[in-house]
């Protein structure tokens, strides 16, 4: 996230009424324009009309009041006794003091079911969990639909991530500041002199008439510009980094003045639109599920091109069970080595896929190869296991990248990196792009992903046996209006639509992070979650 926005969530945690906005981290940011039709496992529209008359809201919106009005209950058609395999329907609504429905349409909820287990793994208590599908009926009521996937006492958990009013602030902010929520720099070091220039996806942000270096690449769907320095060629190598807060390259206050932040802070706080993941209470909050049919029976082998259902899996005793296909679990290093023997893996994207590289290197005890002037955060990274002939590569997707200084000659746009891979039956390509694009309009992300998709199509044409894996976005802190789950999920929806029907694998990191309840949300998921993602990846490399 831009360090500028960090002031909104400083260590002092400035209060908004009775709520507090929690701290965030610099590497997440967010903003976007209108999304495609919003149909997903959290919220999607439905045309059903409730029987009871709906009262239009006329009073100014108050988050504190709305939070107290929201509740949930079992749908009238729900059973009293439940068995594994049944569907559970939960109605979410808000009632005013006269018991009329409050019509707040377009809220962003999060729904899951969970069971906390007594068994602990290490010092961490883990349990069972699965997501629910939210339907927005466009009349102030919502339905959360769950599939009951294990027996025992099951707790229903509903959270309000963003009320519609907070989403409006997000979208309004993006329309007003479409490309300047985060700024970047190119740095030249000439002898003892250091020269910084501003960079971004649109030269209009520079607001001057000086010359511009155009590093855009239409083939890669990438737009990138930097201010031109007099007497320095645009082809001169330098360093890429994120612009620090409140300082432009000339030492001034830059775009994000204190006045701008105060105005934004006032709008967020005193409009009652601070965005926290607020728990919604209801009754019953727990149900008892009896033994039923074997949910995991009759799963097929993990092969490319399988459709990912809205509920794609669940945790049981802290272990991920896929509903897509029969997924693997490894109990030893030898199991991983046997699966990956002779394979070359190419990971490309942001730091959430770099975690794959890091954990495979740790699990396999691989030897990292030093690449001159490469930095860990952006790569390129290379590790090798000579005994089992396993090679794992990782590199960033190119700018925009919110990072510390990294050499520009090491940066490569994702589509171009994919085009350099020969492919083959022993090659695995893993891709994810999302975390560094939340601060831009959807069109910027769309152009980049269209180029990545075209590169994947070219790769599969020249080498159909190459395994291509797309890792979705994952849930993160979600407590910020500028960088929460709403923006990431909009990008994720677009990514899923782009790769729909292609001969690729989807690793649903969104659901795997959303369904668990024993870690706090974090843009970088915990180690056990990453291992589950990698085990699912390996289920396609060496299927059962």
Predicted features along the sequence, with ranges:
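A compositional signature for long Ser/Thr(±Pro)-rich, low-complexity
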Residues: 1-143, 147-461, 465-544
């Amino acid at each position: 996230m831009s360090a500028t926005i960090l002031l909104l969530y400083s260590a002092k945690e400035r209060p908004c009424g009775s709520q507090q906005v929690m701290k965030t981290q610099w590497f997440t940011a967010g903003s976007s324009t209108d999304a495609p039709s919003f149909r997903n496992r959290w919220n999607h529209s439905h045309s059903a009309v409730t029987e009871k008359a709906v009262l239009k809201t006329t009073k100014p919106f108050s988050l504190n009041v709305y939070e107290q009005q929201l509740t949930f209950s079992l749908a009238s058609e729900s059973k009293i006794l439940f068995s594994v395999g049944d569907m559970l329907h939960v109605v979410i609504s808000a009632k005013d003091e006269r018991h009329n429905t409050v019509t707040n349409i377009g809220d962003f909820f999060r729904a899951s079911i969970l069971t906390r287990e007594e068994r602990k793994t290490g010092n961490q208590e883990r349990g069972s969990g699965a997501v629910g599908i939210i339907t927005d009926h466009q009349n102030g009521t919502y339905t959360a639909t769950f599939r009951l996937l294990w027996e025992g006492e099951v707790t229903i958990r509903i959270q309000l991530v963003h009320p519609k009013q907070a989403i409006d602030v997000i979208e309004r902010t993006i329309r007003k500041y479409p490309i300047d929520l985060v700024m970047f720099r190119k740095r030249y070091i000439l002898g003892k002199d250091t020269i910084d220039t501003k960079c971004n996806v649109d030269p209009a942000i520079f607001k001057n008439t000086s010359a511009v270096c155009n590093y855009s690449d239409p083939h890669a769907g990438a737009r990138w510009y930097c201010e031109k320095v007099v007497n320095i060629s645009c082809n001169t190598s330098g360093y890429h980094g994120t612009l620090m807060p409140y300082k432009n390259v000339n030492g001034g206050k830059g775009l994000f003045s204190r006045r701008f932040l105060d105005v934004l802070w006032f709008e967020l706080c005193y409009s009652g639109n601070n965005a926290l993941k607020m728990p919604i209470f209801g009754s019953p909050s727990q149900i008892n599920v009896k033994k039923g049919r074997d949910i995991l029976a009759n799963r097929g082998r993990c092969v490319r091109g399988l459709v990912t259902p809205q509920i794609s899996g669940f945790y049981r005793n802290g272990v991920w069970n896929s509903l897509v296909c029969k997924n693997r679990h490894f109990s030893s290093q030898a199991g991983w080595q046997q699966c990956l023997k002779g394979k070359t893996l190419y990971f490309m994207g942001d730091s959430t896929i770099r975690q794959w590289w890091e954990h495979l290197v740790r699990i396999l005890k691989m030897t990292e190869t030093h690449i001159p002037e490469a930095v860990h955060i952006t790569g390129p990274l290379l590790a090798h296991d000579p005994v089992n002939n396993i090679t794992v590569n990782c590199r960033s997707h190119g700018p925009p990248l919110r990072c510390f200084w990294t050499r520009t000659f090491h940066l490569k746009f994702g589509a171009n990196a994919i085009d350099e891979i020969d492919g083959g039956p022993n090659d695995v390509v893993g891709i994810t792009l999302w975390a560094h694009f939340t601060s831009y309009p959807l069109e910027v992300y769309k152009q980049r992903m269209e180029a990545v998709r075209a590169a994947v199509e070219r790769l599969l044409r020249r080498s159909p046996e190459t395994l291509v894996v797309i890792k979705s976005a994952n849930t993160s802190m979600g407590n910020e209006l500028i960088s929460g789950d709403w923006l990431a999920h909009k990008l994720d929806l677009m990514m899923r639509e782009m790769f729909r029907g292609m001969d690729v694998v989807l690793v649903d990191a969104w659901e795997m992070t959303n369904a668990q309840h024993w870690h706090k949300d974090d843009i970088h998921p915990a180690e056990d979650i990453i291992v589950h993602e990698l085990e699912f990846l390996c289920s396609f490399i060496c299927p059962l």
